Design a protein with these regions (language model features):
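N-terminal cationic and glycine-rich segments that engage phosphates or anionic surfaces
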Residues: 1-104, 108-471
Length: 471
C-alpha cells in the first residue's frame, strides 16, 4: 500500500471529489436509517419493534444487516436484499439461457441492458419483501402485547410504497458510489450497515463485562479487577481469534499466482517492437466478498418465508422448523433455538452456508474472469504464455490454473466463515452473556474484505492520478 501516494493524490480535484461523494452518500444513507415508516404512531411502533428485537433472533439478524433500520423501523428496512437477489437470478440465468449469455458477453451495451433488467426485477421483489416484513413485524408485535392498533389499508399502501422507495434509493446510492466514487457501492453500503452496529454491540459487551454480580476477577492473586471473570476470559479468547482471522483474511486477499506473459518481437521498417515481458496476476480469491453476501442473502429467504407462514398460521410446526433451521445460529439466539444443547439440526445452517460460499466462489469467478476473452486479447496483442500455444490452449491453461486456485480459495473462505459459529458456541457454553453477532461471523468477513478491496482501489486510483509526477 502506497500511503504517501494516496496522501499526494488528495491534491487532485477528481480524487477529492470521489472521496467526498462516497462519504456524502454514506452520511445520507445513515440519515435515511433514522426516517421512520409512516405506520400509525411511529414512536410507539418503533419502541415495540425495539423491544421485539431483544427477544427474537430473526428480527435481530434483520436489524444487523439493515444497519439498525429495523430498530428505527426506517424506510430502508428492506435494504439491498431485493437488488442482491435480482443480481443472483440474472447471473444464474445468464449461464442457463444462451441468448442472455451472448448478451452478457456483448461488451458494455449488453451488460448495461442486463443491469437495467436487474433493477426492474428488484422493484417487485422489494414490494413483496416490504409486505412480508410489515406483516411479520405487525403479527409479532401484536402477539407480544406491546402494541394495540390495526393498520388501515392506507397505512399498508403508504408503508409498502415507502419501504420499496427506500430500497430503490439505496440501490441508486450504491450505483452512484460505483460510478462516481471509489469501490463497489453495494459492498460499501453493506459495510457501512455492519460498521454502524459496532458501537452499540461493543457498548453492550462492555456493560456485561463490568457487571460484577458473579464476582470480580482476581488476577494472579495480586490484582483485583471489577469485571465479570468468566466473560473477561471469553472476550479475551475471542479477541485473539478475531486478530488471527483478520491476519488470515489479509493474507488470503493478498495471495496471488503470477503468470509471466511474453510478447513477440515485431519488425516495422528499421525498428523492432515488442519482445518484452509482462505479468498476469491471478488472485487466490478473485470473487472477493460477493460469495459471502450472496450466501447470506440466499439463506435468509427460507427464514423469511418460514417466519411469514408462522405469523399467518401459529400452529404450523413445519414453518417454525424451517424458520429456525435457516436462522443463522449465534451466541445471542443459541439457547432460544437449542434449549437442550447442540443437536444434528445445528449443523444444517453452517453446512449449507459453507457449501454456498464455495459454490458462489466458483460461480462468480467464472463470470468475472473470462478465460476465453483474456486468451483472445493476448493473442491479438501478440502475447503468449511460455510453453502454451496461443488461443484455445491458453484459455484451457488459464481455466485449469483458476480451478486449482478456486479450490483452495473457496475452501479457505468457507472455513473462515465457519470459525465464528464455533467461537459463538464456545462463548455461550462458557457464559450466559451473548457476545453479539456483529463482532464476528459474516459481518467481520464482509468488513475486512470490503475494506481491503477499497484500499486497493484507492491505491490504484491514487497511482493513476499522480502518474505524471513520476515522468
Amino acid at each position: 500500500m502506497h500511503f504517501k501516494t494516496i496522501l499526494k493524490s488528495l491534491k487532485n480535484k477528481d480524487m477529492l471529489k470521489r472521496i467526498f461523494i462516497v462519504l456524502g452518500i454514506l452520511v445520507a444513507y445513515r440519515l435515511l436509517a433514522h426516517i421512520p415508516v409512516p405506520m400509525g404512531d411511529a414512536k410507539t411502533f418503533k419502541d415495540a419493534v425495539s423491544s421485539l428485537i431483544s427477544k427474537s433472533d430473526f428480527t435481530g439478524f434483520i436489524n444487523l444487516i439493515s444497519g439498525g433500520g429495523l430498530a428505527s423501523f426506517s424506510i430502508i428496512l428492506v435494504g439491498l436484499s431485493p437488488y442482491i437477489t435480482s443480481s443472483i437470478v440474472f447471473q444464474l440465468l445468464s449461464k442457463a439461457i444462451p441468448s442472455l449469455e451472448e448478451l452478457s458477453e456483448d461488451g458494455e451495451t449488453g451488460r448495461r441492458k442486463i443491469n437495467q433488467w436487474t433493477r426492474m426485477l428488484a422493484v417487485p421483489l422489494a414490494v413483496v419483501q416490504s409486505i412480508a416484513y410489515i406483516y411479520i413485524l405487525y403479527q409479532s408485535v401484536v402477539s407480544s402485547n406491546t402494541l394495540s392498533f390495526t393498520p388501515t389499508p392506507r397505512d399498508w399502501v403508504v408503508s409498502v410504497i415507502t419501504m420499496t422507495a427506500g430500497s430503490i434509493i439505496l440501490m441508486w446510492l450504491g450505483e452512484l458510489i460505483t460510478e462516481q466514487g471509489i469501490g463497489n457501492g453495494t459492498s460499501m453500503i453493506i459495510f457501512a450497515s455492519i460498521i454502524s452496529q459496532f458501537p452499540s454491540t461493543l457498548g453492550s459487551l462492555g456493560q456485561q463485562l463490568f457487571d460484577i454480580k458473579n464476582g470480580s476477577l482476581n488476577l494472579f492473586g495480586w490484582l483485583e479487577l471489577p469485571v465479570n471473570p468468566v466473560l473477561f476470559w471469553v472476550a479475551l479468547a475471542l479477541f485473539v481469534v478475531v486478530i488471527l482471522i483478520l491476519y488470515w483474511l489479509v493474507k488470503l486477499n493478498e495471495a496471488q499466482r503470477i503468470i509471466t506473459i511474453n510478447y513477440a518481437k515485431r519488425i516495422h521498417g528499421n525498428s523492432a517492437y515488442g519482445g518484452i515481458k509482462s505479468i498476469l496476476p491471478l488472485k487466490l480469491i478473485s470473487a472477493g466478498v460477493v460469495p459471502v453476501i450472496f450466501a447470506t442473502a440466499f439463506l435468509s429467504l427460507p427464514a423469511l418465508v418460514g417466519q411469514l407462514i408462522s405469523s399467518m398460521d401459529k400452529g404450523n410446526a413445519m414453518a417454525k422448523t424451517i424458520s429456525e433451521i435457516f436462522t443463522m445460529p449465534n451466541a445471542s439466539n443459541f439457547k432460544t433455538l437449542y434449549p437442550n444443547g447442540i443437536n444434528e439440526r445445528w449443523f444444517i445452517y453452517p453446512a449449507l452456508y459453507f457449501l454456498l460460499v464455495v459454490l458462489f466462489t466458483y460461480f462468480y469467478t467464472s463470470i468475472i474472469f473470462n478465460t476465453k476473452e483474456i486468451a483472445d486479447n493476448l493473442q491479438k496483442q501478440g502475447g503468449f504464455i511460455e510453453g502454451v500455444r496461443p488461443g484455445i490452449t491458453t484459455a484451457n491453461y488459464l481455466e485449469k490454473v483458476m480451478t486449482r486456485l478456486n479450490l483452495f480459495g473457496a475452501l479457505a473462505l468457507g472455513f473462515i466463515a465457519m470459525i465464528p459459529f464455533i467461537t459463538d458456541y464456545v462463548a455461550i457454553m462458557l457464559s450466559d452473556a451473548p457476545m453479539g453477532l456483529s463482532l464476528s461471523g459474516t459481518g467481520l468477513l464482509i468488513v475486512v474484505t470490503v475494506a481491503l478491496e477499497n484500499l486497493r482501489q484507492l491505491d490504484s486510483r491514487a497511482l493513476m492520478v499522480t502518474y505524471d509526477d513520476y515522468k
